[in-house]
Design a protein with these regions (language model features):
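Conserved hydrophobic/aromatic packing and binding residues within compact polymer-binding modules
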Residues: 6, 20-21, 43-46
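Short Lys/Arg-enriched helix C-cap and helix-to-coil transition segments
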Residues: 54-70
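A general structural signal for alpha-helical elements within enzymatic catalytic domains
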Residues: 25-29, 68, 126
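Residues at alpha-helix termini
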Residues: 12, 23, 127-128
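A short, Lys/Arg-rich alpha-helix, primarily the initiator
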Residues: 1-13
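Recognition helix of helix-turn-helix/homeodomain-like DNA-binding domains
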Residues: 25-54
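Helix-turn-helix/homeodomain-like alpha-helical modules used for DNA recognition
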Residues: 71-142
């Protein structure tokens, strides 16, 4: 995977370099039978110098996990807000700490993935009903 491909694929997920790097590190597993030892700083640098060959499959798996999370969550949120009304409100988060405080079971997942799923669910509801959900953005806890 070239640096430009990595950068482009990361941007498509909606994550910043830092958010993607932290997600990648949190999902690390073994590489060639040994525990992977990459740091978030290593992962961020790969957008400039390219990732090591040993990280390539793990990068692909991380992108797939992020996309699957957003797809599954958007579907859950859509079914939660339906039937949508003029008073329907859906919550987005402005930072990870506030998001994790509201959803401790999702600790470690970047708030950006939640927000993408929220927007996708709201768009599906709008297309089906013509009603636009209000978006409530939670202020940071700190």
């Amino acid at each position: 995977m070239t640096p430009i491909e990595l950068s482009t694929r990361r941007r498509v997920t909606g994550l910043t370099s830092d958010e993607f790097a932290r997600l990648f590190v949190s999902l690390q597993r073994e590489v060639d039978g040994e525990a992977a030892q990459w740091s978030a700083t290593d992962v961020e640098s790969w957008e400039l110098v390219g990732p090591p060959v040993t990280a390539e499959q793990h990068l692909i798996d991380t992108f797939a996990a992020a996309n699957e999370f957003v797809s599954t969550l958007a579907d859950r949120l859509y079914h939660t807000i339906m039937p949508v009304t003029e008073d329907s409100v859906i919550t987005a988060y402005s930072d990870d700490i506030t998001f994790w405080g509201s959803h401790p079971d999702l600790g470690g997942v970047p708030h950006a993935l939640w927000n993408i799923a929220v927007l996708q669910a709201a768009e599906w509801a709008r297309k089906e009903t013509g009603i636009i959900c209000e978006l409530d953005v939670r202020k940071p806890l700190v």
